[in-house]
Amino acid sequence: MSNGKRLMSTAHDSDLKIVEIKAFPTSFPVKPEDSVSLGVGRAVKRDAIIVKVTTAGGLVGWGESHHGRAPGAVAALVNTTLRQLTLGMNAADVVGVWKKIYDKQLASHGMGAGTCLAMSGIDQALWDIRGKAVGWPVYRLLGGVSRPIPAYAGGVSLGYQPPAELIEEIHPLLAMGYKAIKLRIGDTPKRDIERVTAVRKAFGDALVILTDANTGYDVAAARAAMPGLEANGVGWLEEPFPAQDYRSYALARSFGNVPLAAGENHYTRFEFSRLIEDNVITIFQPDVSKTGGITEVMRIAHMASAYKIQCNPHTSMTGINMAACVHVLASIDNGGYFEGDVSKNNLFRDELVSTPYTVDKNGCVLPLEAPGLGVEVDEDFLIKHPVIEGPSYV
């Protein structure tokens, strides 16, 4: 079928009426041998919330809401208030659905970040439906083209292991094609720099090294670590402090020339506009499962483009989010890296969905070509892996 004929076969508005929204909180335990220590603690389980939106015509869209370390609570918000707000609306009216949730739930007395997490999964599912309705992958709907996007080895990996173990873990990642890796810091400045230095010496200047403190630093630690990070040519220092600690970020800017990165814990374009005004965080990392979905990440990216700020979307838990990130990166002019998930035995990447991306020999990924987000969801997985309440990190 030609592209023109395919566009002519779009569903009628009545077929696109939203008739059901269902969020599925899901978890699996992390084996001790697969657990990684980060600035936020040691992982004991992985959580996710999968959102399913169904239309009157039988189209089904899938999205991921970040669990917010309270998966049952976020899923309940989707299944109650947000469901009631959006039932009966046109699934193609993605902006209208976003605005209604914002006006009625988020803008005033509406649980703030929790609502952003919940609405993000709905938004992704609606984009999935839009693509399926016209037979296009999401990146084409967003105005993008298929092009290689550089990836770095990230996810819940490369934590506080001894330097020799880190080096051993990195070798197979480079064999997979990755040209860039992200090391977890936020332990102590001394041990952090020892790890970064060991990796730099082992692999030379050709390897791009990025770092993520997962909010584990205070101002003194960031000041102590910055010279070593700069000496090793680190590409960025991600989230040294909690997202709303604007004063510490402002102070840290004077500690050296390593760019500060953040955004996975900032919500909606309104919080990102503050980052632009402050001119301290110069690499943005919005998460399509946290900050308001694909719709809002595109707004953030376009806003950042006017200020020459690069966007490197943060990857969440599942292959749904990962596929969505690649679609976004293929559709913006200020995109940077895709965060490849190299965590061990991630069932949300390997079993819940079909393959969300493939890293080629040059360390790049391409957006999926199937209609919508391009991934298929195994609904039996959701039955077999019910939510495990409690903290994800200890």
Regions found by a protein language model. Give the residues of each.
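Hydrophobic faces of well-ordered beta-strands that scaffold small-molecule active sites
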Residues: 61, 151-154, 181-183, 209-213, ...
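Shared catalytic-loop signature of beta/alpha-barrel
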Residues: 80, 227, 233, 244-364
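Short Pro/Gly-enriched beta-strand edge/turn motifs at strand-loop
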Residues: 30-37
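Metal- or metallocofactor-binding catalytic centers and their adjacent structured scaffolds
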Residues: 20-22, 54-133
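Glycine-rich, aromatic-flanked loop segments that form ligand/cofactor-binding clefts
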Residues: 119, 123-159
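Flexible C-terminal active-site loop/helix
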Residues: 4-5, 13-19, 23-30, 48, ...
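Metal-dependent enolase-superfamily TIM-barrel catalytic cores that perform enediolate-based chemistry
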Residues: 147-256
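Conserved, mostly hydrophobic/aromatic
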Residues: 18, 58, 82, 122, ...
